[in-house]
C-alpha cells in the first residue's frame, strides 16, 4: 500500500533518479554504508571484488548506488564506472590516519578526470565512532577541497556506517545540490 502511494505521488510530483558512484580505499566502509542505507541493517561483508549496485529511495529521490571495490588492484577499473555519474561519494576511514595521503591521491585522480569534473562530491569521513578518527573539518582541511575545488559542489560529512550517523544527511545534501530533471 505505502509503496503504491509513493509511486502515485512520484508520478504526480515527479521524482529524481541519479547514479551515485561510491568509491574509496579498501576497508573504508563503502559496502557497510550501502547496505545500512538499503536494508537498515549491518550486512556481514567481505572485501568487494567488482561492485555492488542497489537502489536506495530517500524523499522521492532514487539513488542508484554503485559501490566499487577499493583494493589497489581494482582502482584502475574505477574509470569504467564514471559515465553518467551524478554524484561521487568518496568514503574515507577517518581513523586510518596512515592512509590519508593515499586516499587524497586517489580522490584527486578521480575528480581530475574530464567525466567527473561536473559531479557533486560528498566525502563521508567514516568511522567517527573510533577513538582516533579525524573530525570532518580535519579531513576537509587535509584534503584541501576548499582550495582546489572552486567550481564543484562538495561537502565532508562525518559518518558511522554501523549506527547510520551522517548517512541520511549525506543523501539529503546530494539531493539538494544536484540538478537532475524530474521524471
UniProtKB/Swiss-Prot annotation:
GTP-binding protein involved in protein trafficking; may modulate vesicle budding and uncoating within the Golgi apparatus. InterPro entries: Arf6, P-loop_NTPase, Small_GTP-bd, Small_GTPase_ARF, Small_GTPase_ARF/SAR. The keyword Protein transport applies. A lipid is attached at residue 2 (N-myristoyl glycine). This is ADP-ribosylation factor 3. It is found in: Golgi apparatus. Pfam families: Arf. GO terms for cellular component: cellular bud neck; cellular bud tip; cytoplasm; cytosol; Golgi apparatus; plasma membrane. Signal peptide: none annotated. The keyword Protein transport applies. Interacts with RUD3. GO terms for biological process: actin cortical patch localization; actin filament bundle assembly; cellular bud site selection; endocytosis; intracellular protein transport; invasive filamentous growth; invasive growth in response to glucose limitation; positive regulation of phosphatidylinositol biosynthetic process. GO terms for molecular function: enzyme activator activity; GTP binding; GTPase activity; mRNA binding. Keywords: ER-Golgi transport, Golgi apparatus, GTP-binding, Lipoprotein, Myristate, Nucleotide-binding, Protein transport, Transport. Belongs to the small GTPase superfamily. Arf family. Present with 1240 molecules/cell in log phase SD medium. The gene is ARF3. It comes from the Eukaryota. GTP binds at residues 24-31, 67-71, 126-129. It comes from Saccharomyces cerevisiae (strain ATCC 204508 / S288c).
Amino acid at each position: 500500500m505505502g509503496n503504491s502511494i509513493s509511486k502515485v505521488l512520484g508520478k504526480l510530483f515527479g521524482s529524481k533518479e541519479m547514479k551515485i558512484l561510491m568509491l574509496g580505499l579498501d576497508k573504508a566502509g563503502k559496502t557497510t554504508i550501502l547496505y545500512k542505507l538499503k536494508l537498515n541493517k549491518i550486512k556481514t561483508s567481505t572485501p568487494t571484488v567488482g561492485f555492488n549496485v542497489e537502489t536506495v529511495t530517500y524523499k522521492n529521490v532514487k539513488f542508484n548506488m554503485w559501490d566499487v571495490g577499493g583494493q589497489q588492484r581494482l582502482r584502475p577499473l574505477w574509470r569504467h564506472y564514471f559515465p553518467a555519474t551524478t554524484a561521487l561519494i568518496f568514503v574515507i576511514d577517518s581513523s586510518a590516519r596512515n592512509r590519508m595521503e593515499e586516499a587524497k591521491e586517489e580522490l584527486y585522480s578521480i575528480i581530475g578526470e574530464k567525466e567527473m569534473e561536473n559531479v557533486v562530491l560528498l566525502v563521508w569521513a567514516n568511522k567517527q565512532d573510533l577513538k582516533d578518527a579525524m573530525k570532518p573539518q580535519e579531513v576537509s582541511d587535509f584534503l584541501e577541497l576548499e582550495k582546489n575545488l572552486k567550481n564543484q559542489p562538495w561537502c565532508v560529512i562525518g559518518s558511522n556506517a554501523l549506527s547510520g550517523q551522517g548517512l541520511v544527511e549525506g543523501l539529503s545534501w546530494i539531493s539538494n545540490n544536484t540538478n537532475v530533471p524530474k521524471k
